């Protein structure tokens, strides 16, 4: 005779429901959510302050959400390093600070709005062979000039087969803080979280020459899942 499932009740059931329906939050968001809740607590006698603090905490929790993702299993693919809208696909020189050969490479740019999840994920499985930060401006990340002018952080990942993919975090008008949690020598899996940009930004992905680009401008990308290209 089949047994009935052991359904949790009360607080345990509520906690389980929250875990399955609410995405986890990136640790970088904890100070912002905590500060907002502190404002709500300190101003609990003021309806305006209390509501503003709770609303700010909810907005920050949503912004710093870190939803689980399932990377593709087929070999030889590059996945989107960020959620957002594919705004540019063109051939461009890689960032000069990486001191790579001055040869144009296919570049796919993804714009992250304020409402996208802002964690970045490894577009390729392999070893991090270079990480370079370059100060710059904080212009609109939607503009083509943002790749050259804005503050950026470049990460080069080399696959076991020798293919190299460059993921460039680019700050925007509201994004004034780039977080990168990897360094040269680190190993990353396809779709592993490696960084975050706060409040609106852009991700450029440089592919090896000869890669087969599988996306188009105007398409939405899902970090760690959307296949941008197949390696040559």
From Swiss-Prot:
<keyword id="KW-0444">Lipid biosynthesis</keyword>
<protein>
    <recommendedName>
        <fullName>Phosphatidylserine decarboxylase proenzyme</fullName>
        <ecNumber>4.1.1.65</ecNumber>
    </recommendedName>
</protein>
<keyword id="KW-0865">Zymogen</keyword>
<keyword id="KW-0594">Phospholipid biosynthesis</keyword>
<comment type="pathway">
    <text>Phospholipid metabolism; phosphatidylethanolamine biosynthesis; phosphatidylethanolamine from CDP-diacylglycerol: step 2/2.</text>
</comment>
<dbReference type="GO" id="GO:0004609">
    <property type="term" value="F:phosphatidylserine decarboxylase activity"/>
</dbReference>
<comment type="function">
    <text>Catalyzes the formation of phosphatidylethanolamine (PtdEtn) from phosphatidylserine (PtdSer).</text>
</comment>
<dbReference type="GO" id="GO:0005886">
    <property type="term" value="C:plasma membrane"/>
</dbReference>
<keyword id="KW-0472">Membrane</keyword>
<keyword id="KW-1208">Phospholipid metabolism</keyword>
<comment type="similarity">
    <text>Belongs to the phosphatidylserine decarboxylase family. PSD-A subfamily.</text>
</comment>
<feature type="active site" description="Schiff-base intermediate with substrate; via pyruvic acid">
    <location>
        <position position="201"/>
    </location>
</feature>
<dbReference type="GO" id="GO:0006646">
    <property type="term" value="P:phosphatidylethanolamine biosynthetic process"/>
</dbReference>
<feature type="site" description="Cleavage (non-hydrolytic); by autocatalysis">
    <location>
        <begin position="200"/>
        <end position="201"/>
    </location>
</feature>
<dbReference type="Pfam" id="PF02666">
    <property type="entry name" value="PS_Dcarbxylase"/>
</dbReference>
<dbReference type="InterPro" id="IPR003817">
    <property type="entry name" value="PS_Dcarbxylase"/>
</dbReference>
<feature type="modified residue" description="Pyruvic acid (Ser); by autocatalysis">
    <location>
        <position position="201"/>
    </location>
</feature>
<keyword id="KW-0443">Lipid metabolism</keyword>
<keyword id="KW-1003">Cell membrane</keyword>
<keyword id="KW-0210">Decarboxylase</keyword>
<keyword id="KW-0670">Pyruvate</keyword>
<dbReference type="InterPro" id="IPR033175">
    <property type="entry name" value="PSD-A"/>
</dbReference>
<comment type="subunit">
    <text>Heterodimer of a large membrane-associated beta subunit and a small pyruvoyl-containing alpha subunit.</text>
</comment>
<keyword id="KW-0456">Lyase</keyword>
